[in-house]
Amino acid sequence: MVARVQYSLIVFVSLAFAQESIQTFSMKAAIQYALTHSPSLQNTYLDYQIARQKIAEVRSAGLPQINSTTTLRYFVEIPTSLVPGEFFGAPRGTFIPIRFGVPYNLEIGVTGTQLLFDGTYFVGLSATRAVKELTYRAYQRSRIETITAVSKAYLTVLITQERLRLLKENLDQLQTTLRQTKGLYEAGFAEKLDYQRLEVAYNNLQTEYNKAAELTALAYLTLKLQMGYPLDQPIALSDTLPELPLLLPDSLSLQNFDPAQRLEYQILLAQRRALELNLRRYQVAYLPSLVFISSLATQAQRNEFDFFDTKKRWFPIAFIGFQLQVPLFDGLRKASQVSQARLELLKNQNDLYQLRQALTLEAQNARIQLLNALQNLAIQKRNLELAQTVLETTQKKVEAGLASTVESVQAQNAYQQAQLGYTTALLEAHSVYIDWQKALGLLSEPE
């Protein structure tokens, strides 16, 4: 009775939610939603966008740099210059201090520079493109991780729902048996002990049902979390459990497995390209740099602050030129930077080798785990079929008076355990199948 009330409550709540237009998701739709709304995935995409803007930032250094400057000077003490005394009739070798200038000086101008040659600039621009590729690979890996997490969470909900459905069927069947046994007991055709045994079995099954209902609710929350969906809003699933493809040992061969298909390996390769360009950047830092410089300004000098007097003159100033910078000695700083960059490349080479070995081992382990999971699933499915046959036969014998309630309870428990074993094996097989696809680099976005 408790199970029926609880199930009715679930149906009532479901209908209430349905009136609020519950959003229904297929697995494909759930994955697409997660790829758009997952906060962690959005952050990796923002990292990619930041890398793109970094390229624009570095590129801007090679474009003309134009600035406007305004300089106002007030000389509290006008600068003094020493003029040879013979200009004023003084003895040769003497100097006379004379102040030149006026207190107020205002200069307004525009300066411009253009980088003509700098080896570090061109290499740095290529390096930022490599960093952009690196962040894009990381973004792709995050998408695969999101697909994996959502797929597993979706399947977990389907399987926990299936287990809940099976438990509900068991409860209904056991409740019917319990009611019939109670009638037989009251009529004097069954012992009280038989009825009590069935009641204990029913209560235990009710407890399992309650636990399964809580696990189903938790599975829904986990799915919504992986999707980036609001936890306080209900959802419904439209897909059913997919059939696992029949995979034989030959079809699980790793003969054509290539670690380079994995995004983790591609990320390290992109990192290597960035490190190579970083080394090149330090090496070309020994080359000179050449910059074109120019300035155009106008200047006014006044005894008083009357720069807005249009009747007084302003004097133009203009120049163009080149600035050549040749590195001579920096205390071996660039030599140390080159050595560090080479060592980073060696580390990357070791990382590539280690990752190749690790990915190969992961693929082999995924193959073994999948084979074992499929074998276990076949066994558990057969056990479930046998347990169901035993239960149906035992129930018929009990109705005919050829078997006791003890045998009925035992058959019911065996069937319940077989159901649990089957659903657990089913979840494991689906989860391991996803891991196998990921290990071989076969997991992709739904079309």
Whereabouts are the PLM-identified features?
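Terminal intrinsically disordered/low-complexity segments used for targeting and assembly
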Residues: 1-33, 69, 81-92, 213-253, ...
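Bacterial Sec-pathway N-terminal export signals of envelope proteins
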Residues: 18-71, 77, 231, 237-278, ...
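Small/polar, glycine/serine/threonine/aspartate-rich low-complexity segments that form flexible
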Residues: 20-22, 69-110, 240-248, 293-326, ...
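Periplasmic alpha-helical coiled-coil/stalk elements that build and connect Gram-negative outer-membrane
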Residues: 29, 53, 145-259, 369, ...
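Sec/SRP-type N-terminal targeting helices
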Residues: 42-46, 59-60, 103, 116-143, ...
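Short segments within alpha-helical structural elements
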Residues: 60, 207-229, 384-442
